[in-house]
Curated annotation (Swiss-Prot):
Residues 1-22 are cytoplasmic. Its EC number is 3.2.1.26. Residues 54-72 have a biased composition (Polar residues). It holds the Pfam family Glyco_hydro_32C. Possible role in the continued mobilization of sucrose to sink organs. Induction: Regulation of synthesis appears to be related to the growth of seedlings. InterPro entries: Beta-fructofuranosidase_N, ConA-like_dom_sf, Fructan_Metab_Enzymes, Glyco_hydro_32, Glyco_hydro_32_AS, Glyco_hydro_32_C, Glyco_hydro_32_N, Glyco_hydro_beta-prop_sf. It is found in: Membrane; Vacuole lumen. It comes from Vigna radiata var. radiata. Substrate binds at W127, M128, N129, D130, Q146, W154, W189, T190, R253, D254, E308, D341. This is Acid beta-fructofuranosidase. One of its GO terms (cellular component) is vacuolar lumen.
C-alpha cells in the first residue's frame, strides 16, 4: 500500500558536538620536553620507572568496581570508567531521557528479549566493550574482548575469548586473562596481537595497576601448539612499559599490533595526550621486553584530546587485497585510526609513513586524524583491525554500545555487541577514503529473498514492501532520481548536515529518500536510512547519507539521534545502500562502504512480526525509482565450546 503524505517532523533533536582546535605551541613544547628526555639514547622499560608503581608485595589494595543493582524504576546518571582513566562507559551520563525524564520506560520481558541480536557476536550475558587481539591461527579466527563477568555494566574488566571458523558462528571459550596481578589489578584492558614470522604470538595489553597507573604488559600462549590458545602466560617481567616523563599515569594505553622497521626492529604506537592534544607515542623493540621510546611522535593533532585504541596499518593503492602490517613501499598508503576519548567516535586519516623519520603525514590536513573522516558515523567505537592471512584481507571489528538506559541493560542482563566484521580497503576510485563492507561469510545466513524492481516513489510518498518479517534482514538497494527533476531543480547553496537537519522530515527538492526500517504498520515508530541530495551552484550534486532515530521508539529513556555524513557519489553511479538489520542493530553502508552508519534502535511496537519495511521519498520535487533485494537472515550459531572430558572445562 502507498501513503501519499510526507513524514512528519519530530519535536526535538540532539545538537551536534564540536571540538575546538588549540594552539600548537603547547604541543611543540611537550615534544621538545619528551625529545630531551630520550635524546641520550632512549627511555628503556628495564630502567627506573617514571611513574609510581607498587610491587606485588605492596599493601595497597583497591576493591574491584562492582555492578550496580537498580531495583526500582527510578534511574539516575552514573559515570563509569572516567575515574579509572578510560572513556565514559555509561550512556546514562550523556542523557537523562527525553525532557530530562528520570522514570524508566516500562519495558516488559518480551520487548527486552527482542533486542538481543541473532547474528552479531556477543557473550551469553553481562557487559562487553572493546575488541582485542583478533587474529587467525591454526584454522581458527580468535576474538578477545573486554568483558565484565559480574554484571551488565562496565567494571571488573577481563579478557573474554571466542573462536570461529568463519567469523559468523562462534564458540565461547574460558576467559583468556583475568585481573590477578598487581600490574593489572584494576583491569586487563585493551591490547593487540602480533604474529611473528616464526609463528610465535605476542600479546601486548594495557593493565591498570593496583594504584590505577596504566602500564603495558606482555603475554603469550602457554602452548603454541594448541589451536584454541586456551591458556596464556603473563611475562614475569611485567610491566614492560610505564608512562614516560610528561605523560599522565592515566593517559597511556592500548598498544597496537607491531610492525617491522627497515632496521629489523619491531615498532608499536600507544595513544596518549599532552593537554588537549592527542598524540601517538612510538616505541621500538627487538624482544618485546625492552623498549626504546623514539624521538618525536607518529602524529599529534591539537584539540582532539586523549587518543585511545590507536590503529596503524597499510592499504594497497592497486587492489583490494589486505596487507600484512609490516608492508611499506611506493604502492602503499597508510591508515591511522584513533578513538577519541572526548566524543567516543573512531576517526581515520589516509597518508604516507616515513619509516626513518617515524612520522605519519596525512594526504589532506583537513581530514587529519581526529578531525576528518570516521569509520562509522553512528555507534561504533574502540575498533581494531587485523590482517587475515587466511584470505588475504584486512578485517575491522568495532564495539557497538547501547543507547538505552543502564536500568534496562541490568534488567535484561547484557550490554553491547560487536559489529559484523568488515573488510577494509582503499577506495581506488576516489583515493581519499576507505571502503568497508561486511565479510562475505555473512551471506551464508541468507534465507529466502524478495526482489522489487523499478518501484516508483513519488514526492512525499511511503510505499509498503511486502516481505515476511523485518527483524533480521540483509537489504541491497539502488535509487535513481528522474532526470527531469534533476534538470529543473534550481541550484542552491543550502547547508545540510544529517545531525542538525531535522531528520527525514526535513524536505528538500531532491531528498530525503530511502528506506524505513523497523517500522510498525501505522508508522508510529520507524527508523529512516536515507540519502539527501543538494544541487549546488555549479550544478554538481552533494549527497549525504543519514540514519534518523528520532521516531524509532516511543520509549523515553533511549537516545534518539540523527547520524550520518557526506558520501561521494561519482558520475555514472546510482545511489546505493546495504543494510544489515539484526533486531536492535541497523548497520548501513552507502556507495559500497564509503560512508557507514550504525544505529541502535529500541522500538516498543515494531518488533517481532509487527516489524515492517517501507520505501519512502520525502522530496518535494523528485520522483525516485528504487530496486531492492531483501533477504531474510538466519541466526548465527553462537554457544559455548563443546569441550571433551579431557579438555579444559
Amino acid at each position: 500500500m502507498e501513503h501519499h503524505k510526507p513524514l512528519l517532523p519530530t519535536s526535538s533533536h540532539a545538537a551536534p558536538t564540536s571540538s575546538t582546535r588549540k594552539d600548537l605551541l603547547f604541543v611543540l613544547c611537550g615534544l621538545l620536553f619528551l625529545s630531551s628526555l630520550v635524546a641520550y639514547g632512549g627511555y628503556r622499560a628495564s630502567g627506573v620507572p617514571h611513574a609510581h608503581l607498587s610491587s606485588p608485595t605492596s599493601n595497597h589494595q583497591q576493591d574491584h568496581q562492582s555492578p550496580t543493582s537498580l531495583p526500582s524504576s527510578k534511574w539516575y546518571p552514573v559515570s563509569r570508567g572516567v575515574s579509572s582513566g578510560v572513556s565514559e562507559k555509561s550512556s546514562n551520563l550523556l542523557f537523562a531521557g527525553e525532557g530530562g525524564a528520570s522514570e524508566a520506560f516500562p519495558w516488559d520481558n518480551s520487548m527486552l528479549s527482542w533486542q538481543r541480536t541473532s547474528f552479531h557476536f556477543q557473550p551469553e550475558k553481562n557487559w562487553m566493550n572493546d575488541p582485542n587481539g583478533p587474529m587467525y591461527y591454526k584454522g581458527w579466527y580468535h576474538f578477545f574482548y573486554q568483558y565484565n563477568p559480574n554484571g551488565a555494566v562496565w567494571g571488573d574488566i577481563v579478557w573474554g575469548h571466542a573462536v570461529s571458523r568463519d567469523m559468523i558462528h562462534w564458540l565461547h571459550l574460558p576467559l583468556a586473562m583475568v585481573a590477578d596481578q598487581w600490574y593489572d589489578k584494576q583491569g586487563v584492558w585493551t591490547g593487540s596481537a602480533t604474529i611473528l614470522p616464526n609463528g610465535e604470538i605476542i600479546m601486548l595489553y594495557t593493565g591498570s595497576t593496583n594504584e590505577s597507573v596504566q602500564v603495558q604488559n606482555l603475554a603469550y600462549p602457554a602452548d603454541p601448539s594448541d589451536p584454541l590458545l586456551l591458556d596464556w602466560i603473563k611475562h614475569t617481567g611485567n610491566p614492560v612499559l610505564v608512562p614516560p616523563p610528561g605523560i599522565g599515569a592515566k593517559d597511556f594505553r592500548d598498544p597496537t599490533t607491531a610492525w617491522l622497521t627497515s632496521e629489523g626492529k619491531w615498532r608499536i604506537t600507544i595513544g596518549s595526550k599532552l593537554n588537549k592534544t592527542g598524540i601517538a607515542l612510538v616505541y621500538d623493540t627487538e624482544d618485546f621486553k625492552t623498549y626504546e621510546l623514539k624521538e618525536g611522535l607518529l602524529r599529534a593533532v591539537p584539540g582532539t584530546g586523549m587518543w585511545e585504541c590507536v590503529d596503524f596499518f597499510p592499504v594497497s593503492k592497486k587492489n583490494g587485497n589486505g596487507l600484512d602490517t609490516s608492508v611499506n613501499g611506493a604502492e602503499v598508503k597508510h591508515v591511522m585510526k584513533v578513538s577519541l576519548d572526548d566524543d567516543r567516535h573512531d576517526y581515520y586519516a589516509i597518508g604516507t609513513y616515513d619509516d626513518n623519520k617515524v612520522l605519519f603525514t596525512p594526504d589532506d590536513v583537513k581530514n587529519d586524524v581526529g578531525v576528518g573522516l570516521r569509520y562509522d558515523y553512528g555507534i561504533f567505537y574502540a575498533s581494531k583491525t587485523f590482517y587475515d592471512q587466511n584470505k588475504d584481507r584486512r578485517i575491522l571489528w568495532g564495539w557497538i554500545g547501547e543507547s538505552d538506559s543502564e536500568y534496562a541493560d541490568v534488567t535484561k542482563g547484557w550490554a553491547s555487541v560487536q559489529s559484523i566484521p568488515r573488510t577494509v580497503r582503499l577506495d581506488t576510485k576516489t583515493g581519499s577514503n576507505l571502503l568497508q563492507w561486511p565479510v562475505d561469510e555473512v551471506e551464508s545466513l541468507r534465507l529466502r529473498s524478495d526482489e522489487f524492481k523499478s518501484l516508483k516513489a513519488k514526492p512525499g510518498s511511503v510505499v509498503s514492501l511486502d516481505i515476511e518479517t523485518a527483524t533480521q534482514l540483509d537489504v541491497v538497494a539502488e535509487f535513481e532520481i528522474d532526470t527531469e527533476s534533476l534538470e529543473k531543480t534550481a541550484e542552491s547553496n543550502e547547508e545540510f548536515t544529517c545531525s542538525s537537519s531535522g531528520g527525514a522530515a526535513q524536505r528538500g527538492a531532491l531528498g530525503p529518500f530511502g528506506l524505513l526500517v523497523l517500522a510498525d504498520e501505522g508508522l508510529s515508530e520507524y527508523t529512516p536510512v536515507y540519502f539527501y541530495v543538494i544541487k549546488g551552484r555549479n550544478g554538481n550534486l552533494r549527497t549525504s547519507f543519514c540514519s534518523d532515530q528520532s521516531r524509532s521508539s516511543q520509549a523515553n529513556d533511549v537516545r534518539k539521534q540523527i547520524f550520518g555524513s557526506v558520501v561521494p557519489v561519482l558520475k555514472g553511479e546510482k545511489f546505493s545502500l546495504r543494510m544489515l538489520v539484526d533486531h536492535s542493530i541497523v548497520e548501513s553502508f552507502a556507495q559500497g562502504g564509503r560512508t557507514c552508519v550504525t544505529s541502535r534502535v529500541y522500538p516498543t511496537k515494531a518488533i517481532y512480526g509487527a516489524a515492517r519495511l517501507f520505501l519512502f521519498n520525502n522530496a518535494t520535487e523528485a520522483t525516485v525509482t528504487a530496486s531492492l533485494k531483501v533477504w531474510q537472515m538466519n541466526s548465527a550459531f553462537i554457544r559455548p565450546f563443546p569441550f571433551n572430558p579431557d579438555q579444559k572445562s
